[in-house]
Amino acid sequence: MSATAKHDSNASPNSDSEDGHHHNNKKECAIEYLKARLNSASAVACGYLQAFVSKTQDFAKVCFLELQNPVVLVNLLLHSSVVCYLCNGYANHNARFLKGKPNSTVLATTAGALGLLTLDGIISKKYYSRYDKK
């Protein structure tokens, strides 16, 4: 404590004139501590938010660029329509599509799906670079 604080009857034990901070009581000290912690947490949160926004913008740019490629666009439309068809089928039937079907039907369906997926992969690999704008 400074010499003036020793003689000041109103000075609190938390007063410290050397660093310019005067705390009249523990409540003010706690409030300042909380403000500092909240400012620090806010700065960290802002940093994370800015990084998230930056990564989201980069992702959106890549998506926009990729969707200009007709191969990617056709794949997106094809795959999303298949997913919608399957979800609609399961929702309407409340059971598996192939439940109770003969093994030959299950195998033919599986082979057909695998064949279409393979064909899609081959066609995509062949034509992707032709339309790539990167």
Swiss-Prot record:
Q: Which GO terms describe its cellular component?
A: mitochondrial inner-outer membrane contact site; mitochondrial outer membrane; mitochondrion
Record's keyword terms, sorted: Membrane, Mitochondrion, Mitochondrion outer membrane, Phosphoprotein, Transmembrane, Transmembrane helix
- Region named Disordered: 1-23
**GO biological process terms, semicolon-separated:** protein targeting to mitochondrion; ribosome localization
Gene Ontology MF annotations: nascent polypeptide-associated complex binding
* Transmembrane feature ranges: 71-87, 105-123
Q: Where in the cell is it found?
A: Mitochondrion outer membrane
- What is one Pfam family matched by this protein? OM14_C
Question: Does the keyword Membrane belong to this entry?
Answer: yes
List Phosphoserine occurrences by residue. S12, S15
The answer to keyword Hydrolase applying to this record is no
**What kind of membrane protein is this, topologically?**
Multi-pass membrane protein
Q: Which InterPro entries match?
A: OM14, OM14_C
The miscellaneous annotation reads: Present with 4750 molecules/cell in log phase SD medium.
**What's the protein name?**
Mitochondrial outer membrane protein OM14
Q: Which organism is it from?
A: Saccharomyces cerevisiae (strain ATCC 204508 / S288c)
The encoding gene is OM14
